[in-house]
């Protein structure tokens, strides 16, 4: 079964459970959280028990009598509670039990939203809960992690842009059927999921327009979305915040040495492609996801991800900065012939950030270095990193 392929988050989550009383496993709808807990994680944790609050009776009990609900899971280690945000009252009860017994690995709370005040969750479990984000599947996860030894081809790359990494959709071979699944995902997100935030007055039509613009707009900022949709800027901001809380959008802030406002990217290249996004936008999303997975599940401190926009409105699509201050800049290029002037934006960025490593990702056949810029094939995003050979431009 394609869903059952191993996930890179597994070993990291198991480590968190060894040291933290509560762990939150969070991610957008259909990224594979439930299967991850029920099957992959349960194989590693023989004393675990899984329950979902999608069941109305369980949800009511968890909300109205949370200690009674948790008593049924007393022998589980961990107690895995899916869609935990649907019972805000549960969080106070978890805090109460954890404060009495702080053994690590007692609870795993799964959620398709942030656990925040927007969901009427007052108790943040600060100091008691570790967080693990589950992203769409990476290229290596889709191909069985270490099972695939063949080098990544251009055709593999193009296929991944279109199919994305949502486990229940990416393996559907028929393009029409896959498109229907993507459309179902968009409709469920905009017609149902956003209305979980009962304190907010959210509009299905505006949410649908926002997803389309986040795929197609050159700079999907709040101001641009408000201008195109002719919606109130505050209303647009509220919708963007809600979609970010649902992990549907990833927000990228501008690098402090550049210009511009925050942009919003869809979480998955397949969804972006379905909504009309360009190949470059799909690669930007894939690059961000691959880097997020690589850094989020390591023992190092998380990286900060931004973009760079010059005064001439040219874009470096991703800036990755480590806690140590090390910076990597990635510009995505869509032409097979790379000339010296094409490197100028990255070189200008380095003048402002002298320690930055510069990467130009282009549809070239092999990598090379020129004047401090590494020109690399698109496929480099998904492969084990090797030093490119040197060559003139």
What is the predicted role of each segment?
Residues 1-10:
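Dynamic helix-loop-helix/coil hinge segments at AAA+ ATPase domain boundaries and subdomain interfaces
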Residues 48-78:
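Short glycine-rich substrate-engagement loop in P-loop NTPases that contacts/grips substrate
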Residues 74-90:
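Conserved P-loop NTPase "ATPase switch" module shared by AAA+ and STAND
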Residues 91-113, 123:
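Conserved catalytic/switch belt of AAA+ P-loop NTPases
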Residues 110-114, 120, 136-137, 362-365:
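A short beta-strand-to-loop transition that corresponds to the Sensor-1 phosphate-sensing loop
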Residues 115-130:
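Short regulatory helix/loop adjacent to the ATP-binding pocket of P-loop NTPases
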């Amino acid at each position: 079964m394609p869903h059952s392929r191993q996930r890179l988050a597994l070993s990291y989550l198991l480590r968190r459970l060894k040291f933290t009383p509560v762990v939150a496993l969070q991610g957008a709808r259909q990224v594979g959280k439930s299967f991850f807990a029920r099957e992959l994680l349960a194989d590693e944790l023989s004393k675990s028990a899984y329950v979902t609050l999608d069941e109305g009776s369980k949800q009511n009990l968890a909300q109205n009598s949370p200690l009674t609900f948790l008593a049924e899971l007393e022998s589980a280690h961990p107690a895995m509670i899916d869609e935990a945000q649907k019972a805000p009252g549960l969080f106070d009860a978890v805090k109460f039990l954890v404060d009495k017994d702080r053994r690590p690995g007692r609870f795993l709370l799964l959620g398709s939203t942030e656990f925040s005040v927007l969901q009427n969750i007052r108790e943040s479990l600060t100091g008691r809960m570790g967080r693990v984000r589950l992203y769409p599947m990476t290229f290596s996860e889709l191909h069985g992690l270490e099972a695939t030894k063949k080098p990544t081809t251009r055709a593999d790359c193009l296929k991944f842009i279109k199919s994305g990494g949502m486990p229940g959709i990416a393996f559907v071979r028929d393009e029409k059927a896959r498109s229907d699944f993507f459309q179902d995902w968009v409709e469920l997100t905009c017609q149902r999921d956003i209305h979980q935030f009962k304190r907010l007055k959210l509009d299905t039509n505006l949410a649908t327009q926002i997803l389309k613009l986040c795929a197609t707009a050159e700079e999907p900022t709040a101001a641009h979305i408000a201008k195109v949709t002719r919606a109130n800027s505050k209303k647009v901001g509220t919708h963007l915040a809600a979609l970010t809380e649902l992990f549907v959008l990833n927000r990228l802030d501008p690098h402090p040495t550049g210009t511009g406002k925050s942009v919003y990217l869809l979480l998955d290249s397949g969804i972006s492609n379905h909504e009309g996004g360009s190949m470059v936008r799909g690669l930007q999303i894939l690059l961000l996801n691959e880097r997020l997975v690589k850094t989020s599940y390591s023992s190092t401190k998380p990286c900060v991800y931004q973009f760079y926009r010059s005064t001439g409105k040219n874009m470096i699509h991703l800036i990755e900065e480590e806690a140590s201050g090390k910076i990597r800049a990635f510009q995505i290029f869509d032409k097979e012939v790379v000339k010296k002037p094409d490197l100028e934006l990255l070189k200008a960025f380095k003048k402002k950030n002298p320690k930055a490593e510069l990467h130009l990702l282009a549809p070239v056949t092999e990598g090379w270095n020129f004047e401090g810029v590494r020109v690399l094939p698109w496929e480099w995003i998904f492969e084990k990193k090797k030093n490119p050979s040197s060559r003139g431009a």
